[in-house]
Regions:
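An alpha-helical, amphipathic repeat domain used for nucleic-acid recognition
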Residues: 1-127
């Protein structure tokens, strides 16, 4: 039951996932995990082909890795901008940390962005 029989089908599937990614990136600036989940749902919705979950995630990972190499997705930038946005809305540092963890951001990026806020603000919890 392997739907990807030849190289043309594989390339067509990767190209379709890439198009979904580009259209999503035109509107939003997501984290890697957010984009991965979106692409998975979108591909399953648009395609009636039956893919194994692991194969589909491998296709998505290939597309995401090329987007990271092209600097179209950057979790460090995402963590910094999201932290600034949430601090302006009045979120506490713990709530910001939890929000970034939920978005799939690496812990070192979370620590870096929160430490930048702590350096810039006298008491970031009461901004």
């Amino acid at each position: 039951m392997n739907p990807i029989i030849n190289k043309k089908d594989l390339e067509a599937s990767i190209e379709e996932v890439r198009k979904f990614a580009y259209t999503y990136l035109e509107k939003y600036s997501p984290s890697k995990q957010q984009l991965k989940i979106y692409l998975y749902k979108k591909f399953l919705k648009k395609n009636q082909k039956i893919f194994k979950k692991k194969e589909l995630f491998n296709l998505i990972d290939v597309v995401i890795s090329t987007l990271v190499e092209q600097n179209m997705i950057n979790d460090k930038y995402y963590a910094d901008s999201k932290t600034k946005s949430l601090i302006r809305r009045g979120y506490s540092l713990n709530k910001i940390r939890y929000s970034l963890i939920k978005k799939g951001i690496d812990e070192k990026y979370i620590r870096d962005s929160i430490s930048k806020i702590k350096e810039n603000e006298s008491d970031p919890d009461f901004f």
